[in-house]
Amino acid sequence: SVFDEYLEKSKANK
């Protein structure tokens, strides 16, 4: 899902 992908990206951003 787009939302899930967003969270994944946020995690990688850390």
Swiss-Prot record:
Q: Where in the cell is it found?
A: Plastid, Chloroplast thylakoid membrane
State the annotated membrane topology for this chain: Peripheral membrane protein
Q: Identify the Gene3D superfamilies for this entry.
A: Single helix bin
Keyword line: Chloroplast, Membrane, Photosynthesis, Photosystem I, Plastid, Thylakoid
Q: What is its main location?
A: plastid
Q: Which GO terms describe its biological process?
A: photosynthesis
> What are the record's GO terms for cellular component?
chloroplast thylakoid membrane; photosystem I
UniProt KW Thylakoid keyword? yes
The family annotation for this protein states: Belongs to the psaN family.
- The protein's role, per its UniProt record: May function in mediating the binding of the antenna complexes to the PSI reaction center and core antenna.
* Protein name, entry field: Photosystem I reaction center subunit N
